[in-house]
Regions:
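C-terminal substrate-binding/catalytic lobe of Rossmann-fold NAD(P)-dependent oxidoreductases
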Residues: 4, 15-16, 23-54, 152-290
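Glycine-rich Rossmann-fold phosphate-binding loop(s) that bind the pyrophosphate
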Residues: 10-11
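Rossmann-fold NAD(P) dinucleotide-binding segment
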Residues: 56-65, 73-92
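General beta-strand structural signal in soluble alpha/beta enzymes
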Residues: 91-92, 117-121, 147, 170-171
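Rossmann-fold NAD(P)-binding glycine/threonine-rich loop
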Residues: 93-117
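Oxidoreductase and adenylate-handling cofactor-binding alpha/beta cores
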Residues: 127-143, 158-168, 292
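NAD(P)-dependent Rossmann-like dehydrogenase/reductase catalytic/cofactor-binding core
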Residues: 267-328
Length: 328
């Protein structure tokens, strides 16, 4: 019997989840919930139905796991605890500093209703977090490094678009090659924010806008650009569409450590991702964890979980015997 999936929110992430379900034979998309008028939302799965978010509660016995595809700033802090009262839920909450409080609010709602809520699923947080944990457990004497890119940062692109005089923009985060090599060589460097990444902005300005002012506003923006070496390119709308319409991303999680009685041996653990589509990859991780949420809840588990709490075997459609035979 298929695991019945619902999607809440049908943007880049929601569409990615729909595509990922197509590649997982044990999952079935039943419903997409939207804040828009349902008749205006066209989905790809002919056997699924689009509903208003207001109708979600009526579907609580027809959906095994709801994958919540909202934004971390304002949507998920409200939506995940709210829907954990009705469903097993998965989200991709990625505001690292606020994960503990988000966990607590989802945990209270999910425990009360007897559901599972797996939060902060994706690649960072998510797959990168897991690799940091494994590497820390194995190389206890060492240092962690995370590099992001080269890729489009959605949050930084949005921040540039909000600047006066900007019509559209894309921002790329780029690892500094020399810093990456020093880490890979086991040199254990102490790196500042500026030494690890650069930022590159491609900006379409409004007609007659003050380009020097826009460039200054970008480069001095606190929390986003002021701590980085930032390059700004002004280009046409056509160039932006032609050359920068994709959403690629990726990065590296590296731990460099020492073993031996006198710390005489060096080791480097590296995990890397190179993604054509950031939302489609994130969606694929969400779908694997939806399977895990269903299985864990069937066993009687409830409450909030993170990727740290989910045993790897729960993620895979194959059973234990098959995994031991083919993957171990």
């Amino acid at each position: 019997m298929s695991i019945r999936i619902g999607i809440l929110g049908y943007g880049n992430l929601g569409r990615g989840v729909e595509c990922a379900i197509k590649h997982n034979q044990d999952l079935e998309l039943v419903a997409v919930f939207t804040r828009r008028a349902p008749e205006t939302v066209k989905i790809l799965t002919e056997t699924a139905t689009v509903y208003s978010v207001n109708d979600a509660e009526k579907m609580k016995d027809k959906i095994d796991v709801l994958i919540i595809c909202g934004g971390s700033a304002t949507d998920l802090p409200k939506q995940t605890p709210e829907y954990a009262k009705m469903f097993n839920v998965i989200d991709s909450f990625d505001t690292h500093a606020r994960i503990p409080e988000h966990f607590d609010s989802v945990d209270a709602a999910a425990k009360e209703s007897g559901h599972i809520g797996i939060i902060s699923v994706g690649w960072d947080p998510g797959m990168f977090s897991l690799n940091r944990l494994y590497a820390n457990a194995i190389l206890t004497n060492g240092k962690d490094y995370t590099f992001w890119g080269k890729g489009v940062s959605q949050g930084h692109s949005d921040a540039v678009r909000r600047i006066k005089g900007v019509k559209d923009a894309k921002q790329y985060t780029i690892p500094v090659e020399a810093a990456l090599e020093a880490v890979r060589n086991g040199e254990n460097p102490d790196l500042t924010t500026r030494q690890k990444h650069t930022r590159e902005c491609f900006v379409v300005a409004e007609e007659g806008a003050d380009l020097a002012q826009i460039e200054n506003d970008i480069k001095t923006m606190p929390n986003y650009f002021s701590d980085y070496d930032t390059t700004v390119h002004f280009i046409s709308e056509e160039e932006l569409k032609r050359d920068h319409s994709g959403i690629p991303h990726g990065g590296f999680v590296i731990r460099s450590g020492k073993t031996g009685w006198n710390d005489e041996n060096n080791h480097v653990i590296e995990y890397s991702l190179k993604l054509d589509s950031n939302p489609e990859f994130t969606s694929s991780v969400l779908v694997a964890y939806a399977r895990a949420a269903y299985r864990m809840n069937k066993e009687g588990q409830s409450g909030a979980k993170t990727v740290f709490d989910v045993a790897p075997a729960y993620l895979c459609a194959a059973d234990g015997a098959e995994l031991r035979k083919h993957l171990l």
